[in-house]
Amino acid sequence: MYLSRPTGVARFAASSSSSSSASLFPGVDVDTTTKTGALHFEETKERIKKLFDKVELSVSAYDTAWVAMVPSPNSLNQPLFPECINWVLDSQHADGSWGLLHNDQLLMKANLLSTLACVLTLKRWNIGHDHMSKALDFIKSNIASATDENQRSPVGFDIIFPGMIEYAKDLNLNLPLAPTNVDALVRKKELELRSCRSNSEGGKAYLAYVSEGIGKLQDWDMVMQYQRKNGSLFNSPSTTAAAFMHRNDDGCFDYLRSLLQKFDGSVPTIYPLDIYARLHMVDSLQKFGIARHFKEEIRSVLDETYRCWMQGEENIFLDASTCAMAFRMLRVEGYDVSSDQLTQFSEDIFPNCLGGYLKDFGASLELYKASQIITHPDESVLENINSWTSRFLKHGLSSDSVWSDRTDSVVKQEAVNALEFPYNATLERLISKRAMESYSGDIVRISKSPYACLNFGHQDFLELAVEDFNTLQRIHLKELEELQRWVVENKLDELKFFRLHLGYCYFAAAATLTDPELHDARIAWAQNGVLTTVVDDFYDGGGSEEELDNLIELVEKWDPDGEVGYCSKDVEIVFLALHSTVCEIGRRALVWQGRSVMRNVIDGWLALLKVMRKEAEWSTNKVVPSMGEYMEQAHVSFALGPIILPMLFFVGPKLSEEMIGSCEYQKLYKLMSTAGRLKNDIRSYDRECKEGKLNILSLWMIDGGGNVTKEEAIEAIKGDFERAIRELLGLVLQENTTIPRACKDLFWKLMSIVNLFYMEDDGYTSNRLMNTVKAMFEQPMDLDALLNK
C-alpha cells in the first residue's frame, strides 16, 4: 500500500526509485489464510525451500530515519541519502505514526521511537509539514506509553528517546509534551547513563550501541573501537549513521551505501542477519520434525556456516546467540568445531559484551543448549556455561519479566522445555509435538526497533509439521495394531509373570525413528523391547532354575522341534516367541543387508540370557560381587544388546561381520548400556533395596566401608553417568569411523529414551509418561486449533 503525499509537498530526487508497502516484506506475498482442507504437502515444501534462498528483513522506519538525517559531506544542507527521505514521506501510517505494522499493543514505545525519529528527519530537511503535524498528534496521544513499565522496550529506549527530545530542541521543534513527561524521561536517561558508566566493558558496549541517543556528548573514539570489518557499528544502521555524522568515517559510509543499494531506499534495523536467520530456520525445521524433507538445503546452510566459522566470521563470533547456535548445530552434525570459541561467553567474561550487559535471556538459552554438547573430557568452558546459564534461566523463569528480543511467554516456554528435557533425554516426536503446541506465529523480534523475518517461523512450517505428524500417527497406529496381533499370536499375553508394556516399547521406537520407511526398524525395536522385558521378568523370579537353564539350552540349539524339549509351558511360549521373531527379523534383514544376520541376533540373545542367569545365581546364593564384577554383567543385563543390533540392520547402511565385531561397535554398546544401567540403578535403588536385589548404589556404599552416604554415592554415580554419555556422544559425532553415522545415531537415541524413561520413577510407572504415550498415538494435531489458540 502506498501512502499519498499532501499536495505541494516537495520531494527529494533519489538516485534510484523508492517504494514502500504496508506489508512487512514488500514484494513478498505472505499468505496467512488458514487452510482448513487437505494441505498440498509438496507445494508447502517448495514454499519453504524458497525461504532458504533469501533472508527477508522488514524495513525499520527508525533506522531509515536516522540514515535519512545524514547530511552530504559537500553540503550540510543537503541529505546524503535522499531516497530515505522519500521512503519516510511515503510510509506514514494513517494514525500519524511510522513503524512496523503489528498487532502487539505492548510495542507502543517502539512506535513512539520510530515516529519521533521520522519527525526529526522531516524537520532536519524542512519537508513534510503535514506529516509532522499528524505525527506530533500521535506522539501527544501516546506519550504515556513512554514511561509505562509494562510496555516492551526497544534496546536503549531510555537513552535514545530522551536524547531525541533534546535533539528536537536543537532543531527548534516544539514537541507537544508536558514538562512532567519530559522531566521523567530525562531522569530515567540520567539513571541509565550512570548505571552504564559504572559497569565497565559491558556498559561501554551498550553506550556505544545507543550512540545516537547521546549525540555530541558521546566519546566517539570509544565508539569507533566497535567498528566491524563491514564498516558498521554493531551491524546497526542507526548507530552507524550517527557515527558517520560525527566522524565522517569511510567505512561507515561504505556500509550505509551498500545497504541503500540492497534495500532500495530503506534499511532494516540490523544487517546482515543471514547466518543467524538461516540457522534459526534450520533449528525450527528440526524442532517441528520436518528437517528430513530439506536435507540438501540444510546441508548447504551448515556447510556455509562452517566455512564462516573457520574464517572467524564476525557475524558469528560477535553475537552470542549466533555463535551458540552455530556451535551446537555444527557439532551435532559432525563438523569439527572447538568449544574454545565459546570462552568469551563464560560467566566472568560474558557481561563484558552487549548481550551480557543486557542480560539477554534468549542468548543465554542458546548458550545453555550449546553447553550440553560436550564430547571431550576437558571441555571446562562448556561446563562453566552450562552452570551459569542454567542458574540464570531458572532465576529468569521465577521473575516477572526478562529481556529478550522475543515475547516473554514464548522464550520462557522454550527455557522450561530446555531445562526439563536436556539434550540427552529428548525424542524427536515429543520435540515436534511441543513445538506445534507452542507455536505463536510471532515472527517479530525487537532490537532498537521491531523487525520481522519470515525465516524465523513461517506458518508453512506449522502446516507441514501438522500434516507430517498426522500422517506418521496413522502409520504408527497401523504398526501398533500389527504388534498387538504379534503379542497374541505368540501367546505372550498368557504369561502370568510378564509386565506387558507394548505401548511403551513401541512409543520408544516411534518417537525416535520418525521416517515412514523405517517400519522394519520400529517393529524390530518394539518386538525386542517386549521380549527383553519378558526374559527380564522370567529371570527375575518368574521362572525356576530348571526353566532358566532350559531356555538357554533351547537358544543354544535353536531348534523348536529338537531333542531339548520344554520343561514348562512358559518356557515353550518364551522360546517360540523368540524363535519366530528372530527368524522373521532375519528374513527382513536379508533384504536390507544382502546377507544372513541370524547368527548375530541369536548370539546377542544368548549373551543376555547367560548374564541374566549369572545374576540369578548371585541372588540365590546371596553373592555380593565387586562393583567391577557387577558392572561387567549389569551393562549386558540391562538388555539393550538384543534391541540395538536388529535395528541397525534396518536403517540403510550395510553392516559387515567385521563392523559388528569391531572395537568401535563394542565401545558404543558398552557406553550406551553402562549409562542406562547407572541411570536405572539410581532410580530403582529404594525398590530394589527392599527386595534385596543388587544395585550399583548399594555396592558403592558397601565398597566405601560404611563411610559413604547414599547421597555421596548418587553423586559419584551421576559423575560416572555423565562421563559415559559424553564419551558416547563424542564417539557418535566423530566423523570417518568404522560404524556409519546413521547407525551410531541409534546408540545415542536409545540411550536418550532410556534417560527420559528414568527421569522419573522406574520408567514404566510415570503417569506423565503414560499420558504422553497416549497423546502421541491418540490425539492428532488440529491445525485450525493451533493457529487460533
Swiss-Prot record:
Activity across pH: Optimum pH is 6.8-7.5.
Entry's localization field: Plastid, Chloroplast
CDD domains (UniProt xref): Terpene_cyclase_plant_C1
UniProt binding sites for Mg(2+) 3: N680, S684, E688
Tissue-wise expression: Abundant in most tissues. Present in low amounts in mature cotyledons.
Catalytic activity: ent-copalyl diphosphate = ent-kaur-16-ene + diphosphate
Motif (DDXXD motif): 536-540
Keywords: Chloroplast, Lyase, Magnesium, Metal-binding, Plastid, Transit peptide
Post-translational modification remark: The N-terminus is blocked.
SUPFAM superfamilies in UniProt: Terpenoid cyclases/Protein prenyltransferases (SSF48239), Terpenoid synthases (SSF48576)
Biological process annotations from GO: gibberellin biosynthetic process
GO molecular function terms listed in the Swiss-Prot or TrEMBL record: ent-kaurene synthase activity; magnesium ion binding
Enzyme Commission designation: 4.2.3.19
Listed cofactors: Mg(2+)
Ranges in coiled-coil conformation: none
Pathway annotation: Plant hormone biosynthesis; gibberellin biosynthesis
Protein residues bound to Mg(2+) 1: D536, D540
A GO CC term attached to the entry: chloroplast
Annotated TM spans: none
Cofactor: record remark: Binds 3 Mg(2+) ions per subunit.
Domain statement: The Asp-Asp-Xaa-Xaa-Asp/Glu (DDXXD/E) motif is important for the catalytic activity, presumably through binding to Mg(2+).
Protein name: Ent-kaur-16-ene synthase, chloroplastic
Native organism taxonomy: Eukaryota, Viridiplantae, Streptophyta, Embryophyta, Tracheophyta
